Amino acid sequence: MSRIVVLGAGESGAGAAVLAKVKGFDTFVSDMSAIKDKYKELLDKYGIAWEEGHHTEELILNADEVVKSPGIPNDAPLIMKLKEKGTPIISEIEFAGRYTDAKMVCITGSNGKTTTTSLIYHIFKSAGLNVGLAGNIGNSLALQVATEQHDYYVIELSSFQLDNMYNFRANIAVLMNITPDHLDRYDHCMQKYVDAKFRLTQKQTDRKSTRLNSSHQIIS
């Protein structure tokens, strides 16, 4: 049985852990901070082992794959140790995308993405479509994939959520705008932040499935 370790037990991490457990993985969750009671209850409900307040390296470094919550930087010491071992490190969105055939409409941008995501979701819902709202708003995508059956997902994605995404492909990708933000996470390099945002389009095979704001200088 393959071992999945989830780092971080917030909305993203707890959801990823439930999906991993449902799919038959040996699952362990570790959070350096205190875990909220509602997430402890969720993990306990599915019989998932967890720890809080510290990372026990011997329980983490033996993972076959790690699902990293978006709040953990890629240069954190534990992440660097996992990289040195060659352990694959992916995002919750990447993990969840493996287990659903639902159509994905994904929105990112420095400003306005929550409003746009909510509007698209409302349009889908009003049209009678079976749609879930996920990502930076709504419930964890992984948790919905594990416990619900949606035909469509409208997903708001921050740059942090786009990090550690490699094979995930949106059916429709919307990139609204890019302005300087979170640059401390990207070595104060604007290009690295831009690259993170453009991860949303990395697997697009049809130009018609990508919506770029061509009036925005950085994107155009």
Regions found by a protein language model. Give the residues of each.
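Charged/polar, solvent-exposed surface patches and flexible loops
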Residues: 41, 45, 98, 143, ...
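Phosphate-binding loop of NTP-binding sites
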Residues: 58-61, 70-208
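Short alpha-helical scaffold segments that flank and stabilize functional sites
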Residues: 19, 23, 99, 199-200, ...
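Histidine-centered active-site/metal-ligand motif
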Residues: 54-55, 182-183, 216
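N-terminal leader/targeting and accessory segments in enzymes
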Residues: 1-91, 95
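Single conserved hydrophobic/aromatic residue that forms the stacking wall/gate
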Residues: 208, 212-220
